[in-house]
Amino acid sequence: MDKDDSFLISLIIPVFNESQTITELVTTIKKQSCQPAEIILVDGGSTDNTVQLLKNIIGKENGYRIIEAGRAMPGKARNIGTENANFEWIAYTDAGIVLDKDWLFHLQKKTKDTPEPDFIYGNFSPQINNMFEKCATIVYVPPLRPGSIRTKSIASCLFKKKIWQQVGGFPDWRAAEDLIFMERVEEQGTLVVTEPAAMMYWQLRPDLISTFKKFDLYSKYNVWAGRQAFWHYGIAKQYAVILLFIFLGILHSWYWLLLLPVWLMARAIKRIASHRFEFGWKPLYNPVAFLLIIIITLTIDAATFSGWIKALLQKDGYRKVSME
């Protein structure tokens, strides 16, 4: 299928303190085989030189707009960008991402399906440069299977603007706003399809500390959004069983404690198995990788409980989210 110049798309990107990554993203936008009709970058109050850098990169190029929105979370920034978009079809991606040169082309091509879809999700993969990033992918990135996308991501999608209008846009949250938006889209009976070939690449957190901070924040906002059933309760049930094993080990027989390493290894093996189409079974036989998978898993568990506790203690945040 050749590029359809008559198919006009508005590409919306929220940005905040992205001076280290924004140049690469804009470069991959310029290399798209299917060019968007307009690119709207909504800055959410960057305190570094992101805005000035964008102005230098873009210059007087046609089609680019920078909106300085003041302090704006990702959801609010997307709302502002979408509200200001001039065209029927809206594409979303995020800063810190590298787009495959045919990403938008494949999304656009999918609109030619019959019946015409209202919402198209593309694919994504993490950028893997070292063992930590590979193990992190195994732990918390959804697996990539042949012929399908990893999971639905708001940072790789194309849809009709009317869908955004019908669901009322995004809640103005720091995290989980994308999940709420996507759920509202599905609840409306929107015709949603996927396109595995539309690939973008995103950066993982580079170490345990930043990984903990990320999941601590996500955990807190997911609790405020009332989404514990999708994440927290499952983890809590596992640890309740582990506490039972510990008590039995203390009160009955130390043999019960042997179930602790078995539980940890089983979780690691399950994750390795789910990613076998990407990495094969090699991480299972690499003791360093296997141990690192367990450590990252426990780090995320700790962040889950930490964020959960913070959400329960910070009632103002709960009330703010519940009123959105």
What do the PLM-derived regions correspond to, one by one?
Residues 126-127, 141-159, 174, 200-203, ...:
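A recurrent flexible, glycine/aromatic-enriched loop bordering the glycosyltransferase active site
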Residues 27-36:
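Short, acidic, metal-binding catalytic loop of nucleotide-sugar glycosyltransferases
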Residues 43-52, 94-97:
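A conserved acidic beta->alpha catalytic loop
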Residues 102-133, 203:
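Conserved donor NDP-sugar-binding/catalytic core segment of glycosyltransferases
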Residues 240-315:
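Membrane-embedded multi-pass helical conduit in multi-pass membrane proteins
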Residues 90:
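Short aromatic/hydrophobic "clamp" motif used to bind/position activated sugar donors
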Residues 68-85:
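Glycine-rich, basic loop-to-helix element that forms the pyrophosphate-binding segment
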